[in-house]
Amino acid sequence: PAYIVGIGYGKGWEHASRTRCADLTPSQPDPATLAGLEASPLTKGATYGEAERYHRFMTEELRPVIEAGYPVSRSDRTLWGHSFGGLFALHVLFHHPEAYRTYLVNSPSINWGGGAILGYESKLVAQLEAGKVAPRVLLTAGEYEERLADHIKPYPGVTREQMQAALTAFAMVTNTRGLAERLKAAKAPAGAQFQAMIFEGETHLSAIMPAMSRGLRFALPA
């Protein structure tokens, strides 16, 4: 059996939107991104860059509670995250790869802070090539996270050209696939696994469901 633990906030969508900005980001946004976030009532006034604190909460406070109440494995844990959650999962993978056996990284915001998270990729590669860690990592994204399909309407007040330019700049598919390919090229020990899946016909939001389905099969092989 597997135990699935979800972490929520319980104080309304605006509170959750602001709090996740702090909890799930490892660094500050670039000025242009910050301006856009400040223009939204859901994220205006949010703080950022507290991913390490949130990781400590999960491992030092939440994990002991789970282990005390359920017969969970201490050697076969999985971390799943989408969007900012995917960025958070990469932060943990790069800085604390031993914290989880499997990482399910869906539509990660790799471009956050000018792609600052990729500056720590080499830390993981060094540990892989030293034979110190052997994580299993599935990176996923939706096909239409980088290409605006004909049947998808852009946001109100935004032209198709502007929307496509934004998707191109985010480079979700390119970044996700590229990271998986680089990690696969590392001389990792037996047991390590790196895989990318791009879901045909899916957007940033609709990619969540196939990511969960394929992620469960990846984390819990028969």
Model-derived segments and their meaning:
Residues 1-222:
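Non-catalytic cap/lid and distal C-terminal segments of serine-dependent acyl enzymes
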